């Protein structure tokens, strides 16, 4: 008699994806991030669901309802802070996951990579709309500034912004629709993640060497299930340390002031995970140019497979490319820092230099280094 997990139509799918899946024997902890992202998504959906039970998406009561969740709902404070800080953990895992893909050449799995970029955009959109919901000062002004960027689109810009707002300013209609979108998008993300996994399992996982591992595969369970459980425990430990000791560390104090359209905060800035893109946006004096640079800073990931000029897939044996990769990481950290600073000297010029360096590294320096490494192989 065959095992039920191998014969049952539904169990068979799960078995082939998580139990009997042939996995490379040498994948490192950088390959844990996919499962961690899955855990983050489930956690966000669950905490978000419980928050939605008590939240009201009306401009007059939204701020009060969040305060009510924290003060009066049983364990509401922990659910709220797990949701807010869970988003930060989500983005830490997400950026590390993308970085891993760039370092080890995982972008050569075209379908998997492109779905991943779409997922990144979807998660960013969800996080942005979620930040608007508490209806604090930074929620309101963040929504106003970011949605207003669409007015830079020629001809249709102004109409588009007013259509998104549902009026002539960010108001009740905007908040209600943002709540609706914020609720539905995580389920779309979950569906896309399944497609992402489907395409990955068509080719099998990459590994640190970038060399085919077809001759040396091991079953996913128990080897990588136990490894993923360790990763999950560390993720939950980090999240709970953040939630229980410094829940407001990554938030903005301005968001504890109810939204007031008549009073602009001195420094409008998004959550920390968008600061690098915000710095690129601000570094260009032209509105349309800034918006294009903002979109391209993420969309540039689509070009990664085209910019791959090396004969080797992974950067494991490419020291020049490794140096440039870590310079890129340092550059992104610099941009993140600049995004949180006021628009004044010397931050303006640092931001502009870091923005130019960002595009220069990805579009010119890294492909050139790969070509130099190719020629060195002939020696």
UniProtKB/Swiss-Prot annotation:
GO terms for biological process: mitochondrial electron transport, ubiquinol to cytochrome c. Pfam families: Cytochrom_B_C, Cytochrome_B. Coiled coil: none annotated. GO terms for cellular component: mitochondrial inner membrane; respiratory chain complex III. Keywords: Electron transport, Heme, Iron, Membrane, Metal-binding, Mitochondrion, Mitochondrion inner membrane, Respiratory chain, Transmembrane, Transmembrane helix, Transport, Ubiquinone. It is found in: Mitochondrion inner membrane. GO terms for molecular function: metal ion binding; ubiquinol-cytochrome-c reductase activity. Binds 2 heme b groups non-covalently. PROSITE patterns: CYTB_CTER, CYTB_NTER. Component of the ubiquinol-cytochrome c reductase complex (complex III or cytochrome b-c1 complex) that is part of the mitochondrial respiratory chain. The b-c1 complex mediates electron transfer from ubiquinol to cytochrome c. Contributes to the generation of a proton gradient across the mitochondrial membrane that is then used for ATP synthesis. Belongs to the cytochrome b family. Heme 1 (or BL or b562) is low-potential and absorbs at about 562 nm, and heme 2 (or BH or b566) is high-potential and absorbs at about 566 nm. PANTHER family: CYTOCHROME B (PTHR19271:SF16). This is Cytochrome b. The gene is MT-CYB.
């Amino acid at each position: 008699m065959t095992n039920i997990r191998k014969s049952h139509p539904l169990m068979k799918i799960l078995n082939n994806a998580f139990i009997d899946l042939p996995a490379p024997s040498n994948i490192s902890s950088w390959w844990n991030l996919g499962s961690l992202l899955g855990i983050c998504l489930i956690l966000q959906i669950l905490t978000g669901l419980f928050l939605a039970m008590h939240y009201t998406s009306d401009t007059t009561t939204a701020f009060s309802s969040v305060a009510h969740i924290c003060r009066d709902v049983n364990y509401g404070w922990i659910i709220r802070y797990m949701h807010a800080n869970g988003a930060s953990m989500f983005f830490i895992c997400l950026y590390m996951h993308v970085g891993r893909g760039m370092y080890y050449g995982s972008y050569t799995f075209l379908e998997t990579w492109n779905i991943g970029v779409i997922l990144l955009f979807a998660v960013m959109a969800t996080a942005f709309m979620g930040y608007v919901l508490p209806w604090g000062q930074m929620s309101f002004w963040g929504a106003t500034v970011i949605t207003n960027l669409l007015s830079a689109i020629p001809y249709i810009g102004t109409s588009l912004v007013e259509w998104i707002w549902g009026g002539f300013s960010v108001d009740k209609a905007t908040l209600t629709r943002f709540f609706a979108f914020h609720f539905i998008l995580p389920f779309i993300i979950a569906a896309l993640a399944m497609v992402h996994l489907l395409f990955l399992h068509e080719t099998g996982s990459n590994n640190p060497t970038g060399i085919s591992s077809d001759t040396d595969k091991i079953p996913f369970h128990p080897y990588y299930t136990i490894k993923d459980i360790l990763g999950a425990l560390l993720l939950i430990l980090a999240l709970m340390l953040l939630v229980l000791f410094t829940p407001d560390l990554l938030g903005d104090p301005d968001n504890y002031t109810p939204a007031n359209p008549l009073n602009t905060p001195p420094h409008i800035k998004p959550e920390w995970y968008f600061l690098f893109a915000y710095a690129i946006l601000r570094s260009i004096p032209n509105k349309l140019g800034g918006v294009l640079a903002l979109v391209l800073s993420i969309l540039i990931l689509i070009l990664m497979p085209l910019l791959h000029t090396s004969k080797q897939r992974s950067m494991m044996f490419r020291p020049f490319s490794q140096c440039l990769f870590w310079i890129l990481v340092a550059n992104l950290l610099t941009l993140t820092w600049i995004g949180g600073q006021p628009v004044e000297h010397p931050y303006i010029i640092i931001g502009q230099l870091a923005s130019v360096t960002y595009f220069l590294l990805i579009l010119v320096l890294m492909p050139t280094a790969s070509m130099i490494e190719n020629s060195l192989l002939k020696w």
